[in-house]
A protein has these predicted regions:
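FAD-binding core of flavoproteins
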Residues: 1-70, 191-200
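C-terminal helix-coil-helix/basic helical segment that borders enzyme active sites and/or dimer interfaces
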Residues: 73, 77-87, 101-157
């Protein structure tokens, strides 16, 4: 369309997003999606689903968790025995497991709500904040267990777990921005979910 332009942004996570610009764009009537002037309602509903989808990406950390547990079971610790036998490793893995399970419960709750009706914005926002921050927390814990070599890229000498933790670590950082920054979404949870006054 005339007046529409796109500028790509290549992220540290290895994916591309875009900034879009609209200047005097005229949309032909045949291309209108939904009702005229109903775009805000449409986009906010879509954003709720995007937020839930971003939270669901934290399920990818379950595979990282399983790989890390297996690695810890089969890798000798510097202090003797296996990494999995070290109390610090057990505590980190236990905490990661608890966070993953809590995220799964919240994700299932939101999926149930979506199956019954549209998801409420405050619940989608809470799910996104918890899910994306859980993803970061779990990967931090797994990197504590695996050590610095967990941050070595796939294909590089010394990469552990085929570089999966490094790859996921880069991706999980940018997920906190998609669908709205977590700081903004916390305000939405407070105002829409808890009836608190606006923070700003």
């Amino acid at each position: 369309l005339p007046g529409f332009s796109v500028t790509p942004i290549h992220t540290v996570g290895g994916v591309r997003t875009n900034v879009t610009f609209y200047e005097n764009v005229r949309v032909p009537a045949a291309m209108i999606f939904g009702e005229l002037n109903g775009g805000w309602r449409l986009i906010t509903e879509q954003l709720n689903h995007e937020r839930v989808g971003l939270a669901a990406l934290a399920y990818g950390a379950m595979g990282c968790f399983d790989q890390t547990v297996e690695w810890a079971r089969t890798t000798p610790a510097a202090e003797g025995g296996r990494v999995i036998d070290r109390p610090w490793a057990q505590l980190a893995l236990a905490e990661a497991y608890v966070v993953l399970q809590a995220n799964a419960v919240l994700g299932n709750r939101v999926a149930w709500e979506i199956s019954r009706e549209s998801v409420r914005p405050e619940l989608a926002s809470a799910c996104k904040v918890f899910g994306t921050e859980s993803y970061i927390k779990v990967l931090q814990l797994l990197l504590d267990v695996v050590g610095c070599a967990g941050l070595v890229k796939q294909g590089s000498p010394g990469a552990r777990l085929q570089g999966r933790l490094e790859r996921e670590w880069r991706m999980c950082q940018i997920n906190t921005f998609g669908g709205g920054a977590v700081e903004v979404l916390r305000d939405m949870v407070a105002t829409m979910g808890l009836g608190q006054p606006r923070g700003r």
